Amino acid sequence: MSELIEKAKQAQQASKQLAILTTEEKNRALKQIADQLLVERTYLIEENQKDIEAGQRAGISQTLLDRLLLTDERVQAMAEGVEQVIALDDPIGDQIDEFTRPNGLNIRQVRVPLGVIGMIYEARPNVTVDASVLCLKSGNAVLLRGSSSALHSNKALVSVIHRGLEAANVIPKDAVQLLEDTSRETAKEMFKLNDYLDVLIPRGGANLIQSVVKEASVPVLETGVGNCHVYIDESADPEMAVAIAVNAKTQRPSVCNAAETILVHSAWAKEHVSKLIEELRIKEVQIAGDEQIKAVAPFVKPADESDWGTEYLDLQVAMKIVNSVDEAIAHIDRYGSKHSEAIVSETDANVRKFLTNVDATTVYHNASTRFTDGFEFGFGAEIGISTQKLHARGPMGLRALTSSKYVVHGTGQIKK
């Protein structure tokens, strides 16, 4: 039996035990995980360093190395994240609806776990912990398939999670499984594991996500890439617009809710775009601009078609001048990834048009795109940000990891 099948079977068996646990029992296990992360932080950092050194030898970019890195502060943040999940309401058993039919049948719709969740993700060790604790709290087992470049880190984290679960003696450690075989062939086999997996959630770049979406027969919760836009309207407050655009691009450029393109109304640009460009340059942002942007700032790289569709995940941004909110919406409709889109404006009609017509998980008025996040929305940790429309959309917290069932109580009714 392959490692994949064996671990998937074990996860499925564990999910049945996990589904019937009380909130208190699940929280007790999560508390042990949080404590164990802190107790073993030195071990975690030492194992992570093996991945960092291998990544440096392989020439991995500094941006990817930063995502991969575990520090004392980051392990502390992981443990705090587990504590925050403990504090969240448990959705399992929540009543969604209740009604009584004329024949006397009482029908309740309640939340239940999905079952076994397959996570496929790139070199982000924090996802190992986030996904595990969110799945456990929502009554699900999880099969983790991380990147080969984070294998030492992921093995160490899962071993720490297992020791926490063993200390609590409530949740079987088989509820959290890590695939150590990170080959593409095994990943493709995982895509077809309908007998054991209830859903697949990919987290990573566009190529990873699209390969899962196109090839999987297991249902997929698609976490899309973030080609996000900030549109500065003609009436935008200059100081606010510059602050929002710069924040959306530079506060943390390597994440999916960072802005990748700034669209600027031509009337606003006449007076203020040079200030925006100056502030971006202070933050060391490389700009790719259209001809009108280059006319103001000749040092800007000329933008080509590929720039409008690129998720840079770095200190790079595309800039374009538009003549109306309609032109901005059309550009976003063509190049956007349906993630997070913002308008900075004081014109109510334009704001309404933008918020209504832009197709995205989250649309903003006079705020940075950087708030599309489970913690910022008050959901706690997230397992990803869904850009699809079925089952879940936007930041996916605990509720997104549940399904529902109808519970029907009768008094002897039979169908006539």
UniProtKB/Swiss-Prot annotation:
EC number: 1.2.1.41
UniProt entry keywords in alphabetical sequence: Amino-acid biosynthesis, Cytoplasm, NADP, Oxidoreductase, Proline biosynthesis
GO terms of biological process kind: L-proline biosynthetic process
Pathway participation: Amino-acid biosynthesis; L-proline biosynthesis; L-glutamate 5-semialdehyde from L-glutamate: step 2/2
Keyword Cell membrane appears in the UniProt entry: no
InterPro entries per the UniProt record, alphabetical: Ald_DH/histidinol_DH, Ald_DH_C, Ald_DH_N, Aldehyde_DH_dom, G-glutamylP_reductase_CS, Glu-5-SA_DH, GPR_dom
Domain of life: Bacteria
TM segment ranges: none
Gene Ontology CC entries for this record: cytoplasm
Sequence similarity: Belongs to the gamma-glutamyl phosphate reductase family.
Annotated protein name in UniProt: Gamma-glutamyl phosphate reductase
Lineage: Bacteria, Bacillati, Bacillota, Bacilli, Bacillales
